[in-house]
């Protein structure tokens, strides 16, 4: 089976590429910058030039392709290119995939998209979901919450560097997941007919509130965090005020994203059925506390190695 992966240089996309190559798939990555994507070539993937903002570059990328996995997304602040890439480009991608007789299209969307159609990126993701459903391509849509990898920058690093952490005062559980595990589901969907033409809300086994993640980081780092709480109603008010001005639209959209993860999702009821459908055992899924523990262990080892090298350099200077 030959795969075309969109967004292969991203946090999730690179995991999909690596696991697909390990499993023996023929992997082709649509890229704009060959230099930036060179590590994918070193892994064994084929690189082909393609740009979602230039629809004419898409059809050649699909020649001989069995399945497409789209893990790409624009930054919500890039409004100039948002419609061009995440709507026009992805519509062109679906049409080209249909013309190329692609057998399966896997699309990574976001949780709660239908509840936040006032946010351009969410509106476009929901629109692409709908377009896939209306096409004749067998599809699988994964609605994702957050990645473990994003929590490192949001929580772990500020705790280690004694920087303030901004959180809302809402205690909403978010079922974060490791991108390596999400990649497993993406690839497994290609082998399971029962996952075709379905939309899955994909999350970890446990929901986490901000305070729990901060406490975990404090325990592992051995130091207290600086936490600044911002009421969600104030965040909404600021978002609405900025939204009145064209120059403030980017700020408004970024603030509005805080609301998305503050919609309660009870993954515990559906996780068992989801894992059963994809034939995934609980033990295969990395837990957040284990992920953070491994990160802190690696970091502390690196710091010890750096400290040892500095001591050796000082000794050499003395000698």
From Swiss-Prot:
**EC numbers for this chain:** 1.-.-.-
Against InterPro entries, the record matches this protein to: HCF244-like (IPR044256), NAD(P)-bd_dom_sf (IPR036291), NmrA-like (IPR008030)
Cell compartment(s), UniProt: Plastid, Chloroplast
Chief location bin: plastid
Give the record's GO biological process terms.
Answer: photosynthesis
**A single MF term (Gene Ontology):** oxidoreductase activity
Pfam families this protein is in? NmrA
GO CC term (a single one):
chloroplast
Q: Write the record's keywords in alphabetical order, separated by commas.
A: Chloroplast, Oxidoreductase, Photosynthesis, Photosystem II, Plastid
Q: Which domain of life is it from?
A: Eukaryota
Cysteines engaged in disulfide bonds, as pairs: none
Q: What class of enzyme is it?
A: oxidoreductase
Functional description taken from the UniProt entry: Involved in assembly of photosystem II.
| Record-linked PANTHER family | PROTEIN HIGH CHLOROPHYLL FLUORESCENCE PHENOTYPE 244, CHLOROPLASTIC (PTHR47128:SF2), PTHR47128
Q: Could you say which protein family the record assigns here?
A: Belongs to the NmrA-type oxidoreductase family. Ycf39 subfamily.
**Protein name, per record:** Photosystem II assembly factor Ycf39
């Amino acid at each position: 089976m030959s795969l075309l992966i969109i967004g292969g240089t991203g946090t999730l996309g690179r995991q999909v590429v690596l696991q697909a190559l390990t499993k023996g798939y023929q992997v082709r990555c649509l890229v704009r910058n060959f230099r930036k994507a060179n590590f994918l070539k070193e892994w064994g993937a084929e690189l082909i030039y393609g740009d979602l903002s230039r629809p004419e570059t898409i059809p050649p990328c699909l020649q001989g392709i069995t399945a497409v996995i789209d893990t790409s997304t624009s930054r919500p602040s890039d409004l100039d290119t948002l419609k061009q890439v995440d709507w026009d480009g992805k519509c062109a991608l679906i049409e080209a995939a249909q013309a190329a007789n692609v057998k399966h299209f896997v699309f990574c969307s976001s949780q709660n998209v239908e509840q936040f159609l006032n946010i351009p990126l969410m509106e476009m993701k929901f629109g692409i979901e709908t377009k896939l459903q209306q096409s004749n391509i067998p599809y699988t849509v994964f609605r994702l919450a957050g990645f473990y990898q994003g929590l490192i920058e949001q929580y772990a690093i500020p705790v280690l560097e004694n920087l303030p952490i901004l959180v809302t005062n809402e205690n909403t559980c978010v079922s974060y997941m490791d991108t390596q595990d999400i990649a497993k589901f993406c690839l497994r969907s290609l082998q399971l007919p029962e996952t075709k033409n379905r939309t899955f809300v994909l999350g970890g086994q446990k929901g986490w509130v901000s305070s729990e993640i901060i406490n975990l980081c404090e325990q592992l780092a051995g130091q207290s965090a600086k936490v600044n709480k911002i009421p969600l109603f104030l965040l909404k008010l600021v978002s609405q005020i900025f939204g009145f001005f064209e120059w403030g639209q980017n700020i408004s959209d970024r603030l509005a994203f805080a609301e998305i993860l503050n919609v309660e999702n009870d993954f515990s009821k559906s996780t068992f059925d989801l894992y059963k459908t994809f034939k995934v055992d609980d033990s295969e899924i990395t837990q957040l506390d284990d992920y953070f523990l491994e990160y802190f262990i690696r970091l502390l080892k690196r710091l010890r190695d750096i400290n040892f090298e500095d001591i050796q350099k000082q000794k050499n200077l003395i000698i």
